From Swiss-Prot:
Name of the featured protein: Large ribosomal subunit protein bL36
Keywords for this protein: Ribonucleoprotein, Ribosomal protein
Gene: rpmJ
GO MF annotation list: structural constituent of ribosome
GO biological process, any: translation
InterPro entries registered for this protein in UniProt: Ribosomal_bL36 (IPR000473), Ribosomal_bL36_sp (IPR035977)
Lineage: Bacteria, Pseudomonadati, Pseudomonadota, Gammaproteobacteria, Enterobacterales
Organism per entry: Buchnera aphidicola subsp. Acyrthosiphon pisum (strain APS) (Acyrthosiphon pisum symbiotic bacterium)
Length: 38
């Protein structure tokens, strides 16, 4: 998982989700696209 200041959608299957006031990107297609803002 990458921790980045600004999370970006990298492909079509990436989804932006907000959990516990933390913005995350989850991707079912490519696990390398997982990101967390922080």
């Amino acid at each position: 998982m990458k921790v980045q200041a600004s999370v970006k959608v990298l492909c079509r299957s990436c989804k932006i989700i907000k959990r516990n006031n933390v913005v995350r990107v989850i991707c079912s297609n490519d696990p390398k696209h997982k990101q967390r803002q922080g």
